[in-house]
Amino acid sequence: MASIDPYQHIIVEHQYSHRFTVTVIKATNVTKGTFGDMLDTPDPYVELYISSAPDSRKRTKHFNNNINPVWNETFEFILDPNQDNVLEITLMDANYVMDESLGTTTFPISSVKPGEKKQVPFTFNKVTEMILEFLLEVCSSTDLRFSMALCDQEKFFRQKRKNQVINGLRKLLGPEKTKDLNPTSRDVPVIAVLGSGGGFRAMIGFSGVMKALFESGVLDCVTYIAGLSGSTWYMSALYSHADFPNKGPKEINKELMNNVSHNPLLLLTPQKVKRYIEALWKKKSSGQPVTFTDIFAMLIGETLIKDRMNRKLSHMQEKISHGQCPLPLFTCLHVKPDVSELMFADWVEFSPYEIGMAKYGTFMPPDHFGSKFFMGTVIKKYEENPLHFLMGVWGSAFSILINRVLGVSTNNQGSTMEEEIENLKPKHILGNDSSDSDDEMQEPKGTENSKAEEEYQRNNQASWVQRMLMALLGDSALFNTREGRAGKVHNFMLGLNLNTSYPYSPLSGLCTQQSMEEDEFDAAVADPDEFEQIYEPLDVKSKKIHIVDSGLTFNLPYPLILRPQRGVDLIISFDFSARPSDSSPPFKELLLAEKWARMNKLPFPKIDPHVFDREGLKECYIFKPKNPSVEKDCPTVIHFVLANLQFRNFKAPGVPRETAEEKEFADFDIFDDPETPFSTFNFQYPNEAFKRLHDLMEFNTLNNINVIKQAMVESIEYRKQHPSRCSVSLNDVEARKLLHKDSQSKFQM
C-alpha cells in the first residue's frame, strides 16, 4: 500500500520530455573563403541553438589555426516533444575583435526517433564537412515529485516521531490518561505549533514560547512547528545551531539576545559590503536571479547566524532523522507581478526534506530549489541555496521596505508596516524586470572574443557593483520606489501542463453546506477582493517566479498545517501580528486563515470574533468544532495573542511580583508605547526590551499549560473514537478520472 500514491496526476498533468544529446565530433576543410584564408587561418568553433529549448544555446571550445578540428564535445537539451524542435548549427570563427559566422544550417529533430542514435554529416560553403551525432531519449523520470501525498522521508519521520510523542504525552499527562497509547495505535494525536510574522518582535516572542514549550515538556508532544516571516528566523537560528537540541532554547536565546542588541547599520561597513557584493555578483554571473532580497538575506544572516552562514536547509535533517525534534516547516508566497497578494498567492512550503507547492502537487529536494527546470527535469543545477538566503525570502517584506529597517528617511512612510504594504503596488515590489529574461552571460553570434569579453565583464561587474553599493548606501531609486526587492528564482514548473486548477485539498465533503452558509463564506475580512483569484494557476511559461513574505497575504502559516495528509488534530498558534493598540481585537489574521481554509475545502473551527466583546482581551482563546461528529476532521485551535495581562503582576504562574524593580520591569505596553520599542521595523533590541518580550511570551505560554494539556487529553479521546482521521477512499478524490485504471485498482485493494 505504501507504494500507491492516491493523489498522483491530480493537479499536474504528468508529461514526459525528451533529452536530445548532440555530440559535435569534428569538421574538415574549414574555410573562410579563398581571400579570407589568405589573410588568416580559421579558429573554428560550433554554436548549437534550439529556440524551443529553455537552455537554448550551447557552444564548443575554439581551436586556433586549425582547419580540421576534432571536438568530441557533447551537449544536452531538454525538449517538449509536442513542439516543433529545430536545431540550428552555426560554424564560427573566433577573432580578436569580433567573431565571424562561417555558415549556418538547420536540422529537424523530429527526424530522430526516440532511442535512436545516428551520425549526420553537414556541409558548409560546399567544401567544409562537419560530423554530428544525435541521440533522442524519453525522460521517463523527473526531478520533481508530482503528488499531493507526503514524501517518504516525512512519512518515516512521522513514525519515528510518534514514539517520541507517546513518551512525551505520558510524562506530561500521566499514565492514566495515556495508558492505551502505543506506536501501532492510531489514537496518538498530531499536534502542531505555529508562529506568525512580525519581524524581530515575532522572533523574540517565539523564542520565549519555545523555551516554555521545551522546558514544560509540551514540545516533546509536538510533531510539527510551522513558522512565517519573523518566526522562521527564530526557527532557523534554533535548528541550525550545532548544540540543539542537546542545548535548549534557554542558552541559545541568550546568544540571540546578544546578536540583536547591535545596530544593523554596523553590517554596512565597506569591507562587509564588498564581501556581500562579490557573493552576489558570483551568483548573478552563474545565471541565477539576484534582487534586493539577496542583500537583505545577507544582513539578516550576519545578524542571526553569523557563525554558520554556510548552513543549508537540508542540514536540518540531522536534527529530525530519528524523530528527536518536531519537523520544522517554513513558508513564502509565489505572487504575480500584476495582481495583489491578497487576491492571488500560491503558498510555497519548505521543509528539510522537500520544497514545493501543495496546490499543484509539485515538490523537489531542497538542493534543487533555484535550479533551472523544464517539464519537471533539472536542466541546470546550482548549489543548494544557503539558509540565510531562504531567511531573506521568508521575511522579504522587510527587504521590500528596507528603508524603514535601516532607518533611511523617506517622504512617504506609513505609521505601521500594514499601512506601508497597503500603499505598495505589485509592480513596485516586483519592478519591471522581465521574468523571461536569462541571466547567463551568453555569447550571441558576433560577440567579442574571450579577452575582449573578459574586459567587458570586468566593466559590467564594476558598474553593477557600483549600482548595488549606491543602493545599499541609500543614494538610489531603490530606496524610494521599492522596485526589484522581491525574491526571484527560476520557475521549477516551467513547461508543465496545468489543464485544470483544483482547490488546495484533494478531498471533497470536508465542510458541510450548512457550515459554509453559517460561516458567511464570502464575507470580507480585510479587503473586498481578498482571495479572489486563489484558484488561478501559475504561469508555466514564465522562466522565473517571484517569491515574497507570506505575511503579505495573511500572517499565520496555517496552509502548511492544514494539508489533509498531515492530519493535525491540535494547533497551538502564536500570533505576534501588529495591532492598532493593545486593546484592539486580535483575530484579523486568524479570520483570514479561516476564510482561506473554507475556500479550499479544509476543515477549520468557526472563529467567533464576538468572543472578544464577551470575554475581553485574553492571553489565549480556544476554538473547537461545534459538532465534532459532523466536522470529524476539524482540528482544535488554541490561539495565543500578544498581550501583557497577568504578567504585570506575576513573574511566574502563581508567583506574585514583590519588589518595585520587578513590577517596573513588567509594566509596559506593546503597541501603545509612544517610543515603539516593539515596532515591526525595529531591528535592534536592547537587552531589557528583549527580556521583556521574551519573558512575557514565556509566561503567557506557561500560564496556560493546563489549557494545552486539557486539549491534548481531548484530542486523544477524539482519536479513540475516530482513529482513521485522514482515511481517504477513491470516491473522495476529486478528478479521480485522471488516475490510471491500474492505479485505481491497486488503491482500492
UniProtKB/Swiss-Prot annotation:
Disulfide bonds: none annotated. Residues 1-178 are annotated as: Phospholipid binding. GO terms for molecular function: calcium ion binding; lysophospholipase activity; phospholipase A2 activity. It comes from the Eukaryota. Its EC number is 3.1.1.4, 3.1.1.5. SMART domains: C2, PLAc. Ca(2+) 1 binds at residues 40-41, 43, 65. One of its GO terms (biological process) is phospholipid catabolic process. It is an enzyme of class 3 (hydrolase). Keywords: Calcium, Cytoplasm, Cytoplasmic vesicle, Hydrolase, Lipid degradation, Lipid metabolism, Metal-binding. Stimulated by agonists such as ATP, EGF, thrombin and bradykinin as well as by cytosolic Ca(2+). It catalyses: a 1,2-diacyl-sn-glycero-3-phosphocholine + H2O = a 1-acyl-sn-glycero-3-phosphocholine + a fatty acid + H(+); a 1-acyl-sn-glycero-3-phosphocholine + H2O = sn-glycerol 3-phosphocholine + a fatty acid + H(+). Its main location: cytoplasm. The active site is at 229 (nucleophile), 549 (proton acceptor). Ca(2+) 2 binds at residues 40, 43, 93-95. Residues 442-457 have a biased composition (Basic and acidic residues). One of its GO terms (cellular component) is cytoplasmic vesicle. Residues 417-458 are annotated as: Disordered. Residues 1-124 form the C2 domain. The keyword Lipid metabolism applies. Coiled coil: none annotated. The N-terminal C2 domain associates with lipid membranes upon calcium binding. It modulates enzyme activity by presenting the active site to its substrate in response to elevations of cytosolic Ca(2+). This is Cytosolic phospholipase A2. It comes from Xenopus tropicalis. The gene is pla2g4a.
